[in-house]
From Swiss-Prot:
Key residues/motif important for the effector activities are degenerated in most NLPs, including the nlp24 peptide consisting of the conserved region I (11-aa immunogenic part) and conserved region II (the heptapeptide GHRHDWE motif) that is important for phytotoxic activity. A motif (Conserved undecapeptide motif I) lies at residues 1-9. Induction: Expression gradually increases to a maximum at 7 days after inoculation of pepper leaves. Keywords: Secreted, Virulence. One of its GO terms (cellular component) is extracellular region. It is found in: Secreted. This is NLP effector protein 15. Coiled coil: none annotated. A motif (Hepta-peptide GHRHDWE motif II) lies at residues 16-22.
Length: 132
C-alpha cells in the first residue's frame, strides 16, 4: 500500500474539505522474490476503490505502478492509474517510522479522512480493495 496525505482537498472554490488520505494498493505474486510480478491493483477514491485485475500494461513501469492524483470536479480529488510518465517518490515503511510517528498516525483524527495504513485500518482497507 502506497499512501499520500493532502492537507486540503478543494478542486473548486468554496467546495472540498480539510485533510485527505489517498492510497494505491499493488497486489503481487510473491513478496519474497527480488522482482515480484504485479497481479492486480486498486486505487482509492471517495466512493471506494477502482480495481484493476489485471492492471492495464501501460500503467506498469517495470515493478512500479503509475498513479495520478486527479480532481473529481466539483467536490474531490482521487487517484487513478495512468500511462503517463512520472517521477518516483521516496518510500517510507511503517517499521522505519519512529514510535512517536506511528503513535500519531494511529491516534490523530483527520476528520472524515483516515490514515489507511495505520494499525486499525490497514487490514480492512486491503480487504475492501481486494480485486480477486
Amino acid at each position: 500500500m502506497y499512501s499520500w496525505y493532502f492537507p486540503k482537498d478543494s478542486p473548486s472554490t468554496g467546495m472540498g474539505h480539510r485533510h485527505d488520505w489517498e492510497h494505491a494498493i499493488v497486489f503481487i505474486d510473491n513478496p519474497d522474490v527480488p522482482e515480484p510480478k504485479i497481479l492486480a491493483c486498486s486505487v482509492s477514491s471517495h466512493a471506494g476503490y477502482k480495481k484493476y485485475n489485471p492492471c492495464p500494461p501501460w500503467v506498469i513501469d517495470g515493478t512500479s505502478l503509475k498513479v495520478r492524483y486527479k480532481h473529481g470536479w466539483p467536490l474531490n480529488h482521487d487517484l487513478d492509474t495512468t500511462g503517463d510518465a512520472g517521477t518516483f517518490q521516496d518510500l517510507i515503511m511503517w517499521d522505519q517510522m519512529t514510535e512517536d510517528a506511528r503513535r500519531a498516525l494511529n491516534s490523530v483524527h483527520f476528520g472524515s479522512a483516515n490514515t489507511p495504513f495505520n494499525d486499525g485500518n490497514f487490514k480492512p482497507k486491503l480487504e475492501k480493495a481486494w480485486p480477486f
